[in-house]
UniProtKB/Swiss-Prot annotation:
Biased composition (Low complexity): 28-37
Biased composition (Basic and acidic residues): 166-179, 188-204
Entry-linked PROSITE patterns: WGR
Region Disordered, residue ranges: 1-37, 159-204
Species the sequence originates in: Sinorhizobium fredii (strain NBRC 101917 / NGR234)
A Pfam family assignment: WGR
WGR domain segment(s): 88-175
Top-level taxonomic group: Bacteria
Protein name: Uncharacterized protein y4dW
Keywords, sorted A to Z: Plasmid
Matches recorded under InterPro entries: WGR_dom_sf (IPR036930), WGR_domain (IPR008893), YehF/YfeS-like_WGR (IPR049809)
Amino acid sequence: MRALPGAGTVCDTAGVTERSRENRHPTGRGPRAGSVSAASRAVRHRRLAQHALSHNISDMNRSVPTDSQVSLDAIVGISDSDLMISQPYRLYVERLDPSRNMARYYAMSIEPNLFGDICLLRKWGRIGTKGQMMVHHFGQEEDAVRLFLDLLRQKRKRGYRPRPSLPKEKWPAEAEHESATSAPVPDPEGHLDLDEERNLDGEL
């Protein structure tokens, strides 16, 4: 706008009209094609970026517990059977001799650990005390069962017997295992008396 003496203010529309004319299509129907194509490219790039981002999030990090749409953390195919053993061997026996002030317990179990190994857990001590514990790791369940049966034979020969059934609340804290193996114990072939061949359990 410019002021004219004695004529008030007059709008200078010539420049605005000229710029509008330059930005319009030669036919006079709308903006030039160059400005339209630039805007279209910007929108297209933005949509492609959003699609790529959502695609990456969907393919990575899927986890049902943390997202109902399964958009985080892919699920690892591990079934419960991968960590199971064929027969859960468990044993709890005691050796009591009042004349010698002897009251000992011995517990064993075969269980898998989180890394897929088979473990033989042994726990022993005086009844009413925390006692000691030892864990043996095996790659095959058969090896763990073999040692379990060897130690069972040894304990029977030393006078260990299953504890008589008592109410649960009267059992010592160490009696966390059942009083007998969960499956019949087969008679292993050959002579496996550890008291004569070797002493793997000299602590008792």
